[in-house]
């Protein structure tokens, strides 16, 4: 069989001129604090969109789908693009036929050993009075394009969710598996309070979706929550999210619908542990936050999200695993910063000197927002905040 051309080579087949970063260096007094950099994007920059899917591998940032507006004009799209982090160049990959239909919040991850992407599940818009969820699963590689993966009835049921998925390389093996926790499984009105509106389990994709038997305790079912893999801890981290109203059973945008808990899933023992802290000193209840696992310093970083009253955030916090306390740092940061947003595409990575969070696009609010297609990088030096 002829060896397929690596996906990175496809992306750089027509190399653009190297672009420079548009950024401001932190001053000496700020050198150890995190700082934001706005990225000057080249190539075919995607149109403003939000609530799509993200994946990253070795300098390549992939995005798929999302919504191109807000209610009642929030139509899903099937846009497919890749950003080369080295050349700061976007490439449109929409020329490949047979891929997933237009959708938002699909699970997507990169399979390194196959140089391939997987897209699974997702949803259409809310507030249409219809169940517009998806439960199909697709594979993409540059040699074969898109291929739909056959699934059993049980796998179809587990794929019917809209949430984040993370890729994990199994210890001692050259095999990528993916994990996803909970997520929405309906777009019907008041879905969050319906018995079938949320998935309740942790699932693993390894030649198909399978349920992970985790036992108790376990986090409550939720949607719009971040999920991150901490490789050195061999753990998954979850914070907050949007859930059912356990007090009155009917609330949709009340404080009871938003969570502010922090959980760690040990991939070795397959058990959950809640990381307890004084909520009065933490980020509070929110959904749509983004997380970074700082294994270097024993911290979990959190960026942004949205509150029950519609407030969109751009704050930056870290949780110290040793002291079980939260510290807010954006109030001490200087220089340019992105506007508050949610539903942005993103990835994080570790470099030789820092952790980095890249964000692209998003919406400034759920109702009557501005849709964005700017890109920013948050740099968190290893020496930060010591």
Indicate where each model-derived feature is located:
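Bacterial N-terminal signal peptides that target proteins for export
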Residues: 2-11
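Bacterial N-terminal signal peptides
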Residues: 12-22
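Cleavable N-terminal signal peptides
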Residues: 16, 26-29
């Amino acid at each position: 069989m002829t060896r397929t051309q690596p996906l990175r080579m496809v992306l750089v087949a027509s190399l653009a001129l190297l672009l420079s970063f548009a950024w401001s260096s932190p001053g000496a007094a700020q050198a150890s604090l995190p700082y934001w950099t706005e990225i000057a994007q080249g190539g075919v920059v995607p149109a403003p969109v939000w609530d799509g899917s993200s994946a990253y591998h070795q300098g390549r940032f992939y995005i798929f789908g999302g919504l191109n507006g807000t209610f009642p004009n929030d139509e899903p799209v099937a846009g497919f693009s890749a950003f080369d982090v080295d050349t700061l160049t976007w490439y449109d990959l929409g020329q490949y036929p047979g891929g997933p239909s237009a959708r938002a919040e699909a699970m997507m991850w990169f399979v390194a050993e196959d140089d391939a992407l997987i897209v699974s599940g997702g949803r259409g818009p809310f507030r249409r009075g219809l169940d517009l969820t998806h439960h199909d699963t697709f594979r993409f590689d540059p040699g074969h394009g898109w291929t739909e993966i056959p699934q059993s009835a049980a796998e179809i049921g587990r794929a019917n969710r809209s949430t984040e998925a993370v890729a994990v390389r199994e210890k001692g093996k050259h095999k990528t598996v993916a994990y996803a926790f909970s997520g929405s499984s309906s777009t019907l009105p008041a879905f969050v309070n319906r018995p079938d509106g949320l998935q309740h389990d942790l699932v693993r994709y390894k030649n198909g979706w399978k349920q992970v038997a985790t036992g108790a305790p376990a986090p409550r079912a939720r949607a719009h929550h971040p999920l991150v893999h901490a490789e050195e801890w061999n753990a998954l981290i979850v914070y907050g999210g949007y859930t059912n109203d356990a007090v009155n059973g009917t609330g949709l945008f009340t404080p009871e619908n938003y969570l502010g808990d922090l959980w760690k899933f040990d991939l070795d023992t397959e058990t959950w542990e809640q990381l307890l802290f004084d909520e009065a000193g933490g980020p509070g209840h929110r959904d749509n936050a983004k997380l970074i696992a700082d294994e270097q310093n024993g911290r979990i970083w959190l960026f942004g999200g949205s509150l029950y009253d519609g407030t969109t955030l751009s704050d930056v916090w870290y949780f110290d695993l040793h002291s079980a306390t939260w510290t807010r740092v954006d109030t001490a940061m200087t220089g340019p910063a992105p506007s508050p947003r949610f539903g942005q595409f993103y990835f994080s990575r570790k470099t030789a000197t820092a952790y980095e969070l890249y964000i692209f696009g998003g919406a400034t609010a759920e109702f009557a927002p501005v849709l964005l297609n700017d890109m920013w990088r948050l740099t968190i030096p290893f020496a930060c905040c010591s």
